[in-house]
């Protein structure tokens, strides 16, 4: 389907919502999770931004906005909108679905199928996501549709494809060569430092906000090529340098320690998964300031899928059994070592809209509840270089705000039931 037709479909989806002046009465406000915790607070929102935070429940008139709507969240814990740093919004694993169905679909079909995934993600309280791998002809129109207000969904920071070596985790596997040549989009496939520079520049030309690379093998690629380092050291450095020269940062999918450490030495901003992070990895994280995006939920979900899905290809099944038992220990090692941790789920592998399950696993594996909340707000804003706009509830910030009944610092599972969602000052979900 042509880009013009896809764009027309997007424009017909919905009428843009309009931001309005609002006065929020928060029973408890975690304005800067991990730093501030206050009760009986008023948050004033105008033109999509937070204009003030005041003690007490201030009336609309006393806030200087007599016509503003007052939102009663006096029985709720109010927090900044959550951010998920590892999503795949254009698909979702389903054991009941034909795994080859994508070969019959046009880009427009996939775009339309993605709309519920975006809406479910936003309604779960995730107002910003970093999409770490999708066809640029689909994810970029989705991003623009959200920005224009035509699509209900989270703010999208898009990788717009990925970089992988020939035969690497990011390539298609298990199909005839003539089929692969017909459907494979090879702009991100590179071999050698010069070719990998080209790949990074090509993705940026397409519109990538970030560069996603597969530094190691991966679990869900249908090939018995292992989980070790696949992009070589000089290729990693070339990608990071090329991306930096055009103002982009690099996120590296990496499982085995050698690939994690090589990517960190090359200067990537984040490691995705980090399943075998070792002591050297922790030291490199500390030295570089890079972030771990742990994606704990994806692994747990794959183990659950194994119980009901008898059709997982043997190479994938073997890697699931190899990797997942190591994830908890690796996360705990990174946590104990003071590694920067940014929230990320790998939703698409796991169900969209269930992102908050990651919070539960982070706490189950040893993270304090407030630190888990901070990982999805303050820390994610830092990773995205968006602390001027996102991550906290402060005057001048974009009004991305969520609320839950109950105390998430005592029971993290309440984050799985978000009652209130605001993005860009627009209310998408509110208590009955």
Give the positions of each predicted feature.
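His/Asp/Glu-enriched, well-ordered alpha-helical/loop segment
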Residues: 102, 245, 249, 314-315, ...
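Bacterial N-terminal signal peptides
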Residues: 5-16
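Metal-associated gating/positioning segment near the N- to mid-region
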Residues: 76-150, 166-170, 234, 258, ...
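Histidine/acidic-residue-rich catalytic or RNA/ligand-binding cores of hydrolases
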Residues: 93-97, 139, 169, 221-223, ...
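Histidine/acidic residue-rich metal-binding segments in metalloenzymes
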Residues: 141, 195-292, 322-341, 388
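Divalent metal-dependent hydrolysis catalytic cores, especially in the metallo-beta-lactamase
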Residues: 113-139, 152-162, 208-221, 249, ...
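Active-site gating loops and adjacent loop-to-helix segments of metal-dependent hydrolytic enzymes
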Residues: 90-110, 166-185, 219-232, 288-324
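Histidine-rich, glycine-flanked metal-binding segment
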Residues: 29, 33-79
